[in-house]
Each structure stands twice: as structure tokens, then as C-alpha cells.
């Protein structure tokens, strides 16, 4: 009996192939708790509920520091303290000021002075590195799928060719040697006629090659794979551009919301101050009115007792 392994979420036991590689989750738990990106820091986390769109770390920071602002380097909405996110702050302390990313052209790529840390020799920021690795992984998986499917189709065709050649073998054995000898002079006559006409001729072209069909099929499959790779690369570039635009639009929207919120808070503060000033003036006027009313009463009493 094959060994069973427990899912890290529901703790039910499944075969090893049925669990995911990273989180070791079963299929139902993967559907119920998908891996999503945090709205603020853009890191991937396991979603506990459908309404939960931010990771635990950002949720704690929101409780402590409030809604974050866009980072002045990477434009990610994760600057809880100051104008820079924690990732850019730590990278700046460790590697110095940021450089321009070769993909998104923003000043948010940090040079680690190590070519092994670069992506294909390019200096990319954190977001572009993740997107590039994701696209590369998808391309590898699709190429692997294409190669496996093409290999399976080739194996089927080879089996079919073996079966067909085996079925014809017995019938070909019954051919007489005289018919074979008659065919050879005919081919020689054709060869002599072609050589007499002065055309270049290769004997290998005239003979039947059983593997020619396979070579043609392999060449066609290679061309199809190259075309699909090219189309995939173009689509990946389009996806990267769209993700970049979506990130920029989200950042702009968050920035505008934060600006409007700050403006509303400032207006509420000024309104409160104006109301307090008006109330203070009102109290002073009431005091003055009370003092004036008290001063008029003794004057009236003195005017009555004078005769």
C-alpha cells in the first residue's frame, strides 16, 4: 500500500502526488484557500477568507500605523513609516541607493554586487524579478507539456509504422526473386537515363527511406514549438505590461485616496478650530452682556431713591 501524507490544512491523508509542492495542501484546500497577492506589499500569501486581501504583517501594520502610502522608490503601497517601504529601506541600508530597473525603468533596483543575483544579467527590481520568474516557470511547464505530447505522438506513430511494416513483411516475403531482379534493372535504367541527361543524382534519394516521414514530422513539430514559444513570449510581454499598468493605476488610486483623506482630515480640523473660536467668542459676548446688564440695574435703583 502506498504511503499517505497529511494535508497541512485539513489534516486528511492523501498520496504525495495529490499535495501541492510548497504548502502541502490537498486539492479542496487549494481551492478554498488560494495563493493571492497582498494588496499593499504585493507578496503572495494563503488566503484564509475571500474578504481577506492583505497579509498578516500588513494587517498588523495597518492597526499600528494606519493606511500606508506609496513608496517613493518602488511605488508599492507599503510605506507605513515615512515615504519608503520596509523592503526598500532595508535594501538601501544594505546595498546603497537604488538604480533604474531595466524592465520597468523605475528607480527601485538595488545592485547587490553579485552577477548571480541578476536575472539573465539584467538588474531588475523586486516586482519585475518575481514577474520574470513566474513567466519563466510557466514557459518551462508549457514547453515540458509540449515536448511530452510530441514525444507521445511520435511513439504512437512509430508503433503504427512498426505494425504496418510487420503486416506487410509476410506479403513481401512471397515476392519472387525474378520480380526483384526485374525491378533492379528498371531502377538502373532510370539512373542511367538521369545521368545521361546531365542531372545531378544521389542514389540515396531514389531508395525508399522508412525514417523520412519521422524526420519530417519532427521538423514540423520543432517549427510548431518555436512558433508557440514566440507567441508565448509575446503574450508574456503583454501580461507584464498590463500588470505594470494595473500596479501603476492602483498606486495612483491609493495615492489619490490618501490625498483626499488627508484633505478631508485637514478640513475637519480647520472646521473644528473655527467652531471652537466662534464658541469662545460667543462665551465672551455672553459674559460682556451679563456684565452690562448687572451695571445697569444699580443705576436704575439709584435714580428711584434720589427724591
Swiss-Prot record:
<feature type="region of interest" description="Disordered">
    <location>
        <begin position="287"/>
        <end position="307"/>
    </location>
</feature>
<protein>
    <recommendedName>
        <fullName>Protein FAM76A</fullName>
    </recommendedName>
</protein>
<dbReference type="Pfam" id="PF16046">
    <property type="entry name" value="FAM76"/>
</dbReference>
<feature type="coiled-coil region">
    <location>
        <begin position="217"/>
        <end position="297"/>
    </location>
</feature>
<dbReference type="InterPro" id="IPR032017">
    <property type="entry name" value="FAM76"/>
</dbReference>
<dbReference type="GO" id="GO:0016607">
    <property type="term" value="C:nuclear speck"/>
</dbReference>
<comment type="similarity">
    <text>Belongs to the FAM76 family.</text>
</comment>
<feature type="region of interest" description="Disordered">
    <location>
        <begin position="161"/>
        <end position="181"/>
    </location>
</feature>
<keyword id="KW-0175">Coiled coil</keyword>
<dbReference type="GO" id="GO:0005654">
    <property type="term" value="C:nucleoplasm"/>
</dbReference>
Amino acid at each position: 500500500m502506498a504511503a499517505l501524507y497529511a494535508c497541512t490544512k485539513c489534516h486528511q491523508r492523501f498520496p504525495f502526488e495529490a499535495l501541492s509542492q510548497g504548502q502541502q495542501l490537498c486539492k479542496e484546500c487549494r481551492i478554498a484557500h488560494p495563493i493571492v497577492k497582498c494588496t499593499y506589499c504585493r507578496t503572495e500569501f494563503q488566503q484564509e477568507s475571500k474578504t481577506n486581501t492583505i497579509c498578516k504583517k500588513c494587517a498588523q501594520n495597518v492597526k499600528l500605523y494606519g493606511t500606508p502610502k506609496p513608496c517613493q522608490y518602488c511605488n508599492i503601497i507599503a510605506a507605513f513609516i515615512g515615504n519608503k517601504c520596509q523592503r526598500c529601506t532595508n535594501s538601501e541600508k544594505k546595498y546603497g541607493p537604488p538604480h533604474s530597473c531595466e524592465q520597468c525603468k523605475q528607480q527601485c533596483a538595488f545592485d547587490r554586487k553579485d552577477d548571480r543575483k541578476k536575472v539573465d544579467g539584467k538588474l531588475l527590481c523586486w516586482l519585475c524579478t518575481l514577474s520574470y520568474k513566474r513567466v519563466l516557470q510557466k514557459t518551462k511547464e508549457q514547453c515540458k507539456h509540449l515536448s511530452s505530447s510530441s514525444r507521445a505522438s511520435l511513439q504512437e506513430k512509430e508503433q503504427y509504422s512498426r505494425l504496418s511494416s510487420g503486416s506487410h513483411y509476410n506479403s513481401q516475403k512471397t515476392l519472387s526473386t525474378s520480380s526483384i531482379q526485374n525491378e533492379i534493372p528498371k531502377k538502373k535504367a532510370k539512373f542511367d537515363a538521369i545521368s545521361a541527361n546531365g542531372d545531378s543524382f544521389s542514389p540515396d534519394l531514389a531508395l525508399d527511406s522508412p525514417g523520412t516521414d519521422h524526420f519530417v514530422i519532427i521538423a514540423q513539430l520543432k517549427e510548431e514549438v518555436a512558433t508557440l514559444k514566440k507567441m508565448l513570449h509575446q503574450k508574456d510581454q503583454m501580461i507584464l505590461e498590463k500588470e505594470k499598468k494595473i500596479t501603476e493605476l492602483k498606486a495612483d488610486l491609493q495615492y489619490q485616496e490618501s490625498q483626499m483623506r488627508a484633505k478631508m482630515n485637514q478640513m475637519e480640523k480647520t472646521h473644528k478650530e473655527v467652531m471652537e473660536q466662534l464658541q469662545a467668542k460667543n462665551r465672551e459676548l455672553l459674559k460682556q452682556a451679563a456684565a452690562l446688564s448687572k451695571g445697569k440695574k444699580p443705576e436704575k435703583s439709584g435714580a428711584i431713591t434720589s427724591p
